[in-house]
Amino acid sequence: MITKPTIDRIMEATDIVEVIGEFVQLKKRGANYVGLSPFANERTPSFTVSPAKGIFKDFSSGKGGSVVTFLMELEKFSYPEALKWLAKKYGIEVEETVEAVENREEENHRESLMIVTGYAAKFFHEALLETEEGKSIGLSYFKERGFTNDTITKFELGYSPDQWEAFTGRALQDGYLQEFLEESGLSVKRDNGSLYDRYRGRVMFPIHSFTGRVIAFGGRTLKSDKNVPKYVNSPESEIYHKSNVLYGLYFAKKAIREEDNCFLVEGYADVLSVHQAGIENVVASSGTSLTVEQIRLIGRFTKNITILYDGDAAGIKASLRGLDMILEEGLNVKVVLFPDGHDPDSYVRNFGTAGFKKHIEDNKKDFILYKTDILLKEAGNDPIKKADVIREIVESVAKIPDSIKASVFIKECSYLLQIDERALLSELNKMRLAKAKKDSQQMISRQVPV
């Protein structure tokens, strides 16, 4: 149990606006601060922080309370975990009663998983920097990619030795329980019940939670064997749900808020290289298709997303439909393409920070206008295909909740599509009426007692 004098010191040092501001974009309004709810999907801010009272109130979800309550609700911390997080942030030493220290095994399930993934991150990082195998294979790979010592340390990059039980054996020896090694995905169970290392011979990319704790890993093989998967990622667990996580967000959130823009890239190396170049407002969806939950995470800090694509035209076209949900969440989307043979990682390494920024500034294009352009080129002179393109573009515009913004896009698209603006507006209104009718029917069906 944390002692009362320690709790008092933590609460005295804590600035509720500063802490909540790490998770929610707050704006001053009179004596209070307001922002969009992190607990509910809303477009009009109803989340309020009162620095004078030291409390928050979220009118969307009904939640409210102290900064400790906020952390417990948002990050699912226990009361002691929330206090320890604040203590770490403000450099306060935590004093606990002897009984609490002696009963570490009573820590809850979630915390036990966090502890074992944190231990693994330290093991892999030390294996990278302090073993001959790690230095000659893992570290040389990271250095070849141009990553500095500061980047390697900041992102806690690591290496998993190419042995069956290097990590598992050490973890068991140090008292970590088999159930948590297996559940976290760090170790895999054989038919005979023994465990072996999941990430043998891979460079390791720890994935951090919103508050900076390691919750999962991505492991990349350096072997050329095509039968070996290039990446192995942590399975879903109580602490890791990949649809709710963006790689690099913990390190990017401050810059995203300051720049009022988030660069979205594809892979770990893209994040690391761009961040290292001083452009820190960058995250990756970690190999998964972008989810609504990830979009809402970004939306806490900015309404502007710039998606950075490499030159793979097929991949770009496949992702276009998925981006409509960004519009549906009320965010603004721009697209930047890199030349064939380049991705954000290679481009920033070859042309530097200034060249990278210039390329983005010169080539960024609004998503809907870009989508119109790419689909029109594909349709050519075929009138049937062109009609399909028109419907698809209007469907995208219909997702935009802001009617004024939608009208502006209709005007732009009518010029690009060479079709009367009134025809597009008519189609837009039909789609919106159909959606409103469908939503109304769904609401009624949910209210009818079974």
Predicted regions, residues:
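Short, conserved phosphate-binding/catalytic loop or strand-edge motifs used
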Residues: 88-92, 100, 139-144, 148-166
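Structured, non-catalytic alpha/beta "coupling" segments that mediate domain-domain communication
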Residues: 73-92, 202-221, 345-350, 354-358, ...
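Terminal peptide-recognition signature
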Residues: 37, 58, 71, 142, ...
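N-terminal structured subdomain of primase-like DNA metabolism proteins
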Residues: 1-102, 351, 358, 415
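Conserved active-site segments centered on acidic
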Residues: 81-133
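Phosphate-handling DNA/RNA-contact segment within nucleic-acid enzymes
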Residues: 2, 14, 29, 52, ...
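Conserved phosphate/pyrophosphate-binding and hydrolysis machinery centered on Walker-type P-loop NTPases
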Residues: 10-13, 103-113, 132-136, 157-164, ...
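A charged alpha-helical hairpin associated with nucleic-acid processing machineries
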Residues: 4, 209-210, 253-261, 291-305, ...
